[in-house]
Amino acid sequence: MPRQLGELAAHVGGELLGDPSQLIHGLNGLEEAGPGDVSFYGNPRYRRQFEATRASAVLVGADVPPREGVALVRVANPHLAYAKLLRLFHAPERPAAGVRPGAWVHPEATVHPEAVLLPGASVDRGGRVGARTVLYPGAYVGEQAEVGEDCVLYPNVTVRERCIVGARVILHASSVVGADGFGFAFNPEGEAGPEHFKIPQVGIVRIEDDVEVGACTCIDRATVGETVVGRGAKLDNLVQIAHNVRVGPLSLICAQAGVSGSAEVGTGVVLAGQVGVVGHIRVGDLAKVGAQSGVAHDVPDGQVVSGSPAVPHREWLRASAAAGQMADLLKEVRALRRRVETLEKEKGP
């Protein structure tokens, strides 16, 4: 549905430089946008695209001067404002409440009347599903597990027994909450010979409010106690969270990262793609870990680290620069060695 530009500017709390009655039909990138579209410009590297855009309006920072032929909406954070308008134009459609034919609810489970269970969804004995939560086909809520209100469990999500999921949580397809932790004790005298004796994993996973978990991500239950993902944390696809890990509020963990058992990830931490964190250490609040880093020791609050093993980022940059010069340095060393050998021969015994 088209909306007036003035309404959109008010929605994001922006200052409009342009016609408030102009109709906007959608949003698009600077290069793809055309008449009737809104785009955003928040990074100087896209200046060329901004100057050439055919968008009717652009969300910009407070210091961007007026532009002829394009309405501007000045805001503190153009990217955030763009996200808010995307949500306004593309609000998710929630299926009508109710348990569809083909869904299964155990007689001792509790499903709120406003919840949605699509065909193939299951809620086991003692499971609880909150108001306005949607379970897509194949989603499973195990025995005594709890899923709060306004959650979305996409196809084939598993929330295993006794695990707790808070409110407004999104679990993307095939994610698993509460699989057994990877815990074994070596027994040299097993019945059939030496064995890895399975340690019972009797704890749970607790996911707090406003968490989003990407597709095919696994969060293992604690051996005892809880594995915790804090409020507002966001986990990308293909992330592994091991038993008894604690992920702090508002942390971001990118694809293919793994956090080993009993490690603690603080508040507002960023783990970039393919980061590995060893067990029983702490990554401090607001720390950032560069892609493919291996974190083997505690990281202080606020520190940026990179590399494997991870070291302070500037130190890693210097080491990387030196590594790039290694071939030339080796040539120089060999040349110096030959020169020394020649001088020693000329000098004689």
From Swiss-Prot:
Gene3D superfamilies registered for this protein in UniProt: Hexapeptide repeat proteins, MurE/MurF, N-terminal domain
Alphabetical UniProt keywords: Acyltransferase, Lipid A biosynthesis, Lipid biosynthesis, Lipid metabolism, Repeat, Transferase
Active site: 243
EC number from the UniProt entry: 2.3.1.191
Gene Ontology biological-process entries: lipid A biosynthetic process
Reactions catalysed according to its record: a UDP-3-O-[(3R)-3-hydroxyacyl]-alpha-D-glucosamine + a (3R)-hydroxyacyl-[ACP] = a UDP-2-N,3-O-bis[(3R)-3-hydroxyacyl]-alpha-D-glucosamine + holo-[ACP] + H(+)
GO annotations of cellular component type: membrane
CDD domains associated with the record: LbH_LpxD (cd03352)
SUPFAM superfamilies reported for this sequence: Trimeric LpxA-like enzymes
UniProt function note: Catalyzes the N-acylation of UDP-3-O-acylglucosamine using 3-hydroxyacyl-ACP as the acyl donor. Is involved in the biosynthesis of lipid A, a phosphorylated glycolipid that anchors the lipopolysaccharide to the outer membrane of the cell.
Family assignment from sequence similarity: Belongs to the transferase hexapeptide repeat family. LpxD subfamily.
Subunit comment: Homotrimer.
Protein name: UDP-3-O-acylglucosamine N-acyltransferase
Organism: Myxococcus xanthus (strain DK1622)
Gene this protein is translated from: lpxD
